[in-house]
């Protein structure tokens, strides 16, 4: 929603208010695990691999470590997004964003199940029972 094709300098960036120095994988997660679009996991990870190959020209990265960082960064980003969507609903009366929570939560569920070191977060999410609230 925040990128568009322009006559030059593609892509055009419409919204960069969260532009910060952060994890190497943050921008990639933002594009490939977007809160508004469902990408097939196979396509997502192929694009991640393509990015990593290009990155490895400048910085040597282990594939499994990069994928882990990609996934964990996604969990952080998606937890933040769910909070923002909830705030937009309750404070700003923009309930349309609630429609994006199930997709966003699904990303989190997938990753906390994928990695054993995420078991405490997985347990907490089950206790909170966000799914039932959706």
Where are each of the predicted segments found?
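ATP/Mg2+ or Mg2+-diphosphate-binding catalytic cores
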Residues: 83-134
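Histidine/acidic-rich helix-loop-helix segments that form or flank divalent-metal centers
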Residues: 60-68
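Exposed alpha-helical structural elements
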Residues: 27, 46, 65, 117-124
